[in-house]
């Protein structure tokens, strides 16, 4: 089954999020543009959630960063209603496609200092097994 979960403490990335190189390496321009519209605390929460989402998506495709997949190849965008939408590119997209995935669904939640992201691969064909 194509399922991935990641959990972070809300402040776990604080030091890294203050570094421009980290933001540029990890986040797509669209993710940073959304975060720029928030105050400092909400931007930090938003970007931490996006990082957890990327980690959960990596687990879905069965690889990790450093295997030719970079964090920016997994962009967590927003639907018209604000829900997270996963956009894969590069090697991440090829791995998912080769596994038979049409895409990845993602949910991110923030509660009491924790961030949790749960992701699920969506099969390309109706009736296709998740195995």
Name these PLM-found stretches.
Residues 1-131:
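Core catalytic alpha/beta fold that binds nucleotide/phospho-ligands
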């Amino acid at each position: 089954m194509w399922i991935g979960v990641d959990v972070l403490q809300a402040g776990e990335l604080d030091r890294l999020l203050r570094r421009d190189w980290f933001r540029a390496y990890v986040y797509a321009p669209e993710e940073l543009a959304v975060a720029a519209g928030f105050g400092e605390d909400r931007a930090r929460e938003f970007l931490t959630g996006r990082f957890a989402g990327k980690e959960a998506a990596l687990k879905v495709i069965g690889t990790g960063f450093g295997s030719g997949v970079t964090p920016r190849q997994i962009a967590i965008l927003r639907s018209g209603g604000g829900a997270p939408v996963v956009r894969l590119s590069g090697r991440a997209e090829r791995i998912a496609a080769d596994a038979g995935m049409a895409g990845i669904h993602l949910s991110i939640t923030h509660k009491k200092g924790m961030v949790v992201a749960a992701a699920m691969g969506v099969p390309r064909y109706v009736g296709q097994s998740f195995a």
